[in-house]
């Protein structure tokens, strides 16, 4: 596996320069674009990594999975009364579909859906940002994980579209908390700073029937883990989920920080990072690396 990861990074490195960093979030626009890392965490506890796998980056929308898992833990099936688990086929920050469907987001991985999940969690936790941070620390076994306040503040200063989604949902009585408070928590979640190894470990429970080896806790039931994986497979890469399924064939979740996490059920969790994005907001080189890895070891679930 180690030789394979090194080989794959060498093969995809020439693609660097073809994408663009997420400069609409000023703090992310400062990230050096030519970085590339990958990590694989097996269910047997082995970790393999290559490239810039130990360089921390902003996880952004990857955090939506952690938020969803927290909500499932404390509210179970009730959460689906306020949002769906269908693909949207729209950009992740679209307001058109949200208006048309009366403030009920299609799934928890578009921005509106993630805001509903944060609204649900906000009512359950006294300190939502700290609760999220501590949860992620347990999942990856790294007590040093923190949220980058510079990134969170940068996103909050450019919150208009997310605020619009929240207020639109509030007009349909599908958003109950204080919009500004929920937005601050949401951006702190997105601004969590982790590296590929951290994220591969943190997502290990989804490859292991909901069991986290680091903390020894059953994070989700096996059935719930399967359900989360299914939503990742259909909605985890914005409006490019179909292309990811075609090319990689695994449940995945991306973020505009350039990270992509993929789950190989019963076998491993993988994280790749390259900050240059394609037109859909997903890591251009990261997707190419995952496509090669999945093909070489026959990991597609299809």
Curated annotation (Swiss-Prot):
One Pfam family per UniProt: Glutaminase
GO biological process terms, semicolon-separated: glutamate biosynthetic process; glutamine catabolic process
UniProt keyword list: Hydrolase
Catalysis: reaction(s): L-glutamine + H2O = L-glutamate + NH4(+)
Coiled-coil region(s): none
Residues annotated to bind substrate: 61, 111, 155, 162, 186, 238, 256
EC number of the protein: 3.5.1.2
Single GO term (MF): glutaminase activity
Enzyme class, spelled out: hydrolase
SUPFAM superfamilies, A to Z: beta-lactamase/transpeptidase-like
Superkingdom, natural source: Bacteria
HAMAP family named among the record's database cross-references: Glutaminase
Protein family: Belongs to the glutaminase family.
Subunit structure, interactors included: Homotetramer.
Listed name of the protein: Glutaminase
Organism: Pseudomonas syringae pv. syringae (strain B728a)
Gene designation per UniProt: glsA
């Amino acid at each position: 596996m180690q030789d394979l990861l090194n080989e794959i990074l060498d093969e995809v490195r020439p693609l660097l320069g073809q994408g663009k960093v997420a400069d609409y979030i000023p703090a992310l626009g400062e990230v050096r674009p030519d970085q590339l890392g990958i990590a694989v965490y097996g269910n047997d506890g082995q970790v393999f990594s290559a490239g810039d796998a130990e360089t921390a980056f902003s996880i952004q929308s990857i955090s939506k999975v952690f938020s969803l898992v927290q909500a499932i833990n404390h509210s179970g099936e009730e959460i689906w009364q306020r949002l769906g688990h269908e693909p949207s086929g729209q950009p992740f920050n679209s307001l058109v579909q949200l208006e048309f469907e009366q403030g009920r987001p299609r799934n928890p991985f578009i921005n509106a859906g993630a805001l509903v999940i944060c609204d649900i969690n906000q009512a359950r936790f006294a300190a939502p940002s700290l609760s999220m941070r501590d949860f992620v620390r347990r999942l990856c076994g790294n007590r040093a994980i923190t949220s980058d306040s510079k990134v969170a503040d940068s996103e909050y200063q450019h919150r208009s579209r997310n605020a619009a989604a929240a207020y639109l949902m509030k007009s349909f009585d599908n958003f109950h908390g204080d919009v500004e408070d929920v937005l601050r928590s949401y951006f702190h979640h997105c601004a969590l700073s982790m590296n590929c190894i951290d994220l591969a470990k943190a997502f290990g429970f989804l490859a292991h029937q909901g069991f986290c080896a680091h903390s020894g806790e059953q994070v989700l039931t096996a059935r719930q883990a399967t359900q989360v994986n299914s939503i990742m497979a259909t909605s985890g890469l914005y409006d490019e989920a179909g292309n990811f399924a075609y090319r990689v064939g695994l449940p995945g979740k991306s973020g505009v920080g350039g990270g992509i996490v993929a789950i190989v059920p019963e076998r491993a969790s993988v994280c790749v990072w390259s900050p240059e994005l394609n037109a859909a907001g997903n890591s251009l080189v990261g997707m190419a690396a995952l496509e090669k890895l999945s093909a070489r070891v026959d990991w597609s679930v299809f």
